[in-house]
Amino acid sequence: MRTLTLLTALLLLALQVQTQSLEETADQVPAQDQPGAEAQDITISFAGDERSAREASKSLIGTASCTCRRAWICRWGERHSGKCIDQKGSTYRLCCRR
């Protein structure tokens, strides 16, 4: 039982280190790719039919905090809920925390 606990703790530590290194990599985006101080319009779209998109958007209202991320994965505690497209056509990952 102690061995299982130790292995689980090591696995969680390895996952946390990997997540932190991915976040650091995402934070090192060149300056020209960083959004400026000007306001930017973002379009949020959900894959699937209109009904599922409506249901997904209703489930996000008031219960989630969402962020458009450049990283390939969402951060700890977030889940991938769709995509964001800026005015230039760049696609980002919509990550929501409940």
Curated annotation (Swiss-Prot):
Propeptide: 20-63
Protein transport recorded as keyword: no
Signal peptide residue numbers: 1-19
Pfam families (alphabetical): Defensin_1, Defensin_propep
GO BP term (any one): antibacterial humoral response
Cell compartments where the protein resides: Secreted
Keyword list, A-Z: Antibiotic, Antimicrobial, Defensin, Disulfide bond, Secreted, Signal
Annotated GO MF terms: phospholipid binding
Tissue specificity statement from the Swiss-Prot or TrEMBL entry: Paneth cells of the small bowel.
GO cellular component labels: extracellular space
Disulfide bonds: C66-C96, C68-C84, C74-C95
Family the UniProt entry places it in: Belongs to the alpha-defensin family.
Alphabetized PANTHER family for the sequence: ALPHA-DEFENSIN 1 (PTHR11876:SF28)
Function: Has broad-spectrum antimicrobial properties. The antimicrobial activity decreases in the present of salt in vitro. Binds anionic phospholipids, which leads to the aggregation of liposomes in vitro. Membrane permeabilization of the target cells is an essential part of the peptide's mode of antimicrobial activity. No hemolytic activity against sheep or horse erythrocytes.
Protein name: Alpha-defensin 1
Lineage: Eukaryota, Metazoa, Chordata, Craniata, Vertebrata
